[in-house]
Each structure stands twice: as C-alpha cells, then as structure tokens.
Amino acid sequence: DEMVAASAASEKIELQQSAIKKLQLRIKNTDEDDPAKPQLMERMGDMLWQKARYYELEAYDYLSKANEAGAAGDTAKQQQLLAKKTEDEKIGREAREEMLKLYREILKYHSDYEQIDKIRYYMAFNMAEMGYAGEAYEQYSGIVREHSNSRYLPEAFLGMAEYSFTIEEDMPTALQQYQKVVSVDPNSSAASYAMYKMGWCYFNLGEPKKALAQFEKVIREADKG
C-alpha cells in the first residue's frame, strides 16, 4: 500500500512540475502590456502555493512518523525521516518565496490589475505565515488605505490587529483595529475572532470587567449561531 501511495505521489509531483513549467513559459512569452499576463501570474502563484502546501503536509507527515520511530527506539529511522522532513520544508518554503516574488512583480508592473487587492491579501497572509510580519503589515495596511471597498478589508484589519497585539504588544491600537474588523462586516468570518481578541485587549489593559463582558458577548453570539 505504501509503495502504491508513493508512486501516486511521485506521479502527482511530476504532473505539477510539468504544469508549472508550461505556465512559466507562457508567462515569459506574454507581452508585459497584455491584460492576460497578471492573470497568468496569479494562476502561477496559486500553483506554487499548492506545491508549497503539498510539501509542507508531507513534512508534517514525516515528523509524525519520525516521532513514532523515536518512541519505538529506532533512532536511525527517526533521523532518516527527520532529514526528509527538513528537505520537504525547504522545497515548500522555496515555492512560497517564488510565489511572493511573482506577487511583488504583479504589484510593481500591473498595479491596475482588477484583482490587486486579492494579490495584496495573499501576499500579506503568506508573509505573516513565513515570519515576515513587518512586510505583511505593510500589505494589510495597503489594502485598508487603497482598497476601501475590498472584500478582504475585514481580514486586512485583522492582520493589522494581530501584528499590533502580538508583535508590537500595543493593546490600544490592537483594540481599535479589532473593533474595525467587526464594524466593517459583523458577519465576516474574521469578526467573531476579532470580538474574542478584543476581550484579551481589555484584559491586558487592566480592565477585567470589560474583558469578562466581552467574552460573555462572544459566547452569546456563538450560541445564536
């Protein structure tokens, strides 16, 4: 069964790489002023993200198996699996870096692309996941500043709030930004999480009564749902 699974995975990787190479060539042969170019680049970004996720999940699987081998006392197998994990993590990160490079090119050369707010959001989300918190904040704030009607506005305010809360530990600013998430779209998926984090802002600001009231409000809203 493992051999069949490995063969299927190998075939999937080959098909993925072939599709990426074909699209890379198509992008290269498309004129810079062709409206299709940023669309093709966005599609390439999606494919690179899928590639990254595949290898990241494989790396997680290797880690799980390595832990099992370690628990069973098979140190040699554990080290072998951990080496595979490291290799797949590297491939996954390289795919994300390539994706970010593409998105930066779209921003630089195709700033009038109709989906530019989406590109900025994807950039910011991946930057945050990869540890580029400051750059992620710049893109989130860019959405707020330049795309006031964007569907990604709640997520942009949430990304800014998370930076203010976690990195800057600036509770007053974080609280305001979480409040903006809720006011922009109370029904967004980001709003319920923002309401919860508002409770922690109040708690960290030394207002336990407000924090408790906020947490109770979150529970009531969850019960309604």
Indicate residue ranges for each PLM-predicted region.
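Acidic, polar-rich low-complexity tracts and alpha-helical solenoid repeat scaffolds
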Residues: 1-225
